[in-house]
Amino acid sequence: MPPKKKGIGGSKKEKTKKSTPEKDDGLTEKYRRSVLDVSVLKEHLALRSGVARQATAVRDELKSQVRDLEQLLSQERSDMKDITADLNRQYKSMETDLQSKADKLEASVDLLEKQLAECQVELKSERELRENTEAEKDAIISDLQSKLDSMERECEKILHGCLDSLLSHLADTRMKWEEQSTVIHQDVKDMLREFGINPLHM
């Protein structure tokens, strides 16, 4: 390495010695700036600490709210489970009741259908019996009417025969009475004449 030049080195020292006040001013400025930076950093750190505390408080509050919500959700799930169980129980009970009622109704329907079939059979039998009875009654009435007509004709014949016989008997009796009356009348006239009485003057 080439030897250092003293002249140059001496001049630098002189320059350094001469620039010491300026260097002090620079250090003062740097110190002032450093103090300012430290103050700003402290304020920034204080602000960050405040924000961190607020964030922590918010986080704790949120955690508390989350715990409350989880408890509420757990309670609601428990309530929902109880409600679901109760609804299932009610549904099964209603289903059992409805099935029982349906079975009873089905049994009632079967019984009513059986009774209806029996009633229809009885009704058919009663209708046939009534029709047969009416037919027999009509036949009896027709037979009685026929007999009555025959008896009426016979009675008319007998009546006419009796009337004819009576009229004939009356005619014969009348003739006999007239003959007897004529004889009696003549006898009376003869008796009157015997007594001298003229029958024409009476």
UniProtKB/Swiss-Prot annotation:
Residues 50-161 form a coiled coil. GO terms for cellular component: cytoplasm; cytoskeleton; motile cilium. Residues 1-29 are annotated as: Disordered. Residues 11-29 have a biased composition (Basic and acidic residues). It is found in: Cytoplasm, Cytoskeleton, Flagellum axoneme. InterPro entries: DRC12-like (IPR033585). The keyword Zinc does not apply. Keywords: Cell projection, Cilium, Coiled coil, Cytoplasm, Cytoskeleton, Flagellum. Its main location: cytoplasm. It comes from the Eukaryota. Belongs to the DRC12 family. Component of the nexin-dynein regulatory complex (N-DRC). Component of the nexin-dynein regulatory complex (N-DRC), a key regulator of ciliary/flagellar motility which maintains the alignment and integrity of the distal axoneme and regulates microtubule sliding in motile axonemes. This is Dynein regulatory complex protein 12. The lineage of its organism: Eukaryota, Metazoa, Chordata, Craniata, Vertebrata.
